[in-house]
Amino acid sequence: MKKNNQSIDTLVLITNRQLLKDDISLATYGVALSRGIERIQKYGKHCINHTEESSLTYNIRRAYRSTVKANLHSTKLPDARADSAEPDNWMRNHSSLYTLCRDTDLPFEEYLQLCDAIGDTVVHHGKVITNREQLAIVLATAKRIHLPTNLIRYWQSEQEELWITLQQHFHDITMWSTVHNEDDIKLLASLGIPNLEYVLISPIFPTPCKTGHPGIGVKRGKELLKQIQTHYPQVQGIALGGIHEHNYQTCLQHSITGVAIMSDFMKRVHSHIDI
């Protein structure tokens, strides 16, 4: 009998188009992301993107028509059963799904277009914000904002005006951050963030993104989560770094709420690109 995959409470998909081998347009990338996310949202029941065209920006909408509608029959993926051996099958058994848009090298307007294409699951990354006008736009539109501890330190020292403005809106936003060590915990504890929802704890396992780092391991990750929860009892931990099908369950067995994946997710996104 086939063993069922353990349920993931919270699954975080992380975008990074630099992992794609092909040089594609932003519009095509947005459509591929939307497809990949929808597939995982539907617990393996694939369907063509049903996002209403009116909710998409002009560039994304134009690509939607050309790459989805015009090629409907050629682009439709095979139907997938819940018990099939699809590469992303393990990602589908989740309760909550978020997509952290990490393509912060994009110009600000293009970044916002990509977030629009991702849809309701999107978490905006604070690194894309460089001035008060941009901060105001993100504060007005984003449901969640991810501010890693290294970015917080940078804003405090080099972008003080941005940091002060953000603090004035602490009660209006839901924030995410990162925890790598005790220094990060001390920093977050000193801030008293009212709505700190998740912290990404990393790197749990070795990952090409941090060459030479052995990973902190799941036990260390659990210890860091317990420490941050003494200051933020409501905060949940997400394991990040080297997470894949064969090790994610180990994280869940150590009191970590969920897992974040980038490489495996971007492989699935690549499979949704029409070359």
In which residue ranges do the predicted regions lie?
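Alpha-helix-loop-beta-strand connector modules within alpha/beta enzyme cores
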Residues: 117-124, 169, 177, 216-238
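Active-site-adjacent beta->alpha loops and helix N-cap segments on the catalytic face
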Residues: 105-117, 133-134, 148-166, 207-225
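Glycine-rich phosphate-binding active-site loops on the catalytic face of alpha/beta enzymes
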Residues: 149-155, 200-212, 252-275
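Glycine-rich adenosine-cofactor-binding loop
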Residues: 235-247
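Conserved N-terminal beta1-alpha1 strand-loop-helix module at the mouth
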Residues: 1-52, 59-67, 71, 83, ...
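Short, flexible/disordered intra-domain loops and linkers
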Residues: 20-26, 157, 210-215, 271
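Generic beta-sheet signal
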Residues: 131, 148, 178, 201-202, ...
